[in-house]
Amino acid sequence: MAEFELEVLQPERVFFKDNVEMIVLRTIDGEIGIMANHQPIVVPIGIGKLRIKKDGKWREAAIAGGLLEVKNNKATILSDAVEWPEEIDRQRALLAKERAEKRLEQKLPPDEYERYRAALYRALNRLKLAEENKEEI
């Protein structure tokens, strides 16, 4: 299968950089798959899983939103938070979930409500990915 370059960047590190066969991730409009020679695009990424296929095998990471750019057979992802399942601190994610749920029970201005709703989705995404990959860690 043809490959393309994938680079996943965070403010503090290069999370991933290698040639891959395919990636699948959630945009704000739904799930998208990218393969070699994909048309140029720039799309916002939603909270969810980043699935990477390399050498015929899939690997998943939790991603907390960001931006995807594809051009010239290269995909670049910019995100504040991307984690492999083994990097996820389950206890910290559980505390973040509980904190967000508690705040969402209160009457909040719309901007604060959206911030805590996103925090809840991030925590749930991290917990789900960690649970699904518990046996592999």
UniProtKB/Swiss-Prot annotation:
One Pfam family cited in the UniProt record for this chain: ATP-synt_DE
An example Gene Ontology molecular-function term: ATP binding
Main location: membrane
Its membrane topology: Peripheral membrane protein
Location in the cell: Cell membrane
A GO cellular component entry from the record: proton-transporting ATP synthase complex
Keyword check for Lipid metabolism: no
Keyword Ion transport: yes
Keywords of the record: ATP synthesis, Cell membrane, CF(1), Hydrogen ion transport, Ion transport, Membrane, Transport
InterPro entries associated with the record: ATP_F1_dsu/esu_C_sf (IPR036794), ATP_synth_F1_dsu/esu (IPR001469), ATP_synth_F1_dsu/esu_N (IPR020546), ATP_synth_F1_esu_C (IPR020547), ATPsynth_dsu/esu_N (IPR036771)
Protein family: Belongs to the ATPase epsilon chain family.
Record's subunit section: F-type ATPases have 2 components, CF(1) - the catalytic core - and CF(0) - the membrane proton channel. CF(1) has five subunits: alpha(3), beta(3), gamma(1), delta(1), epsilon(1). CF(0) has three main subunits: a, b and c.
Primary role: Produces ATP from ADP in the presence of a proton gradient across the membrane.
Name the UniProt record assigns to this protein: ATP synthase epsilon chain
Organism the protein comes from: Caldicellulosiruptor bescii (strain ATCC BAA-1888 / DSM 6725 / KCTC 15123 / Z-1320) (Anaerocellum thermophilum)
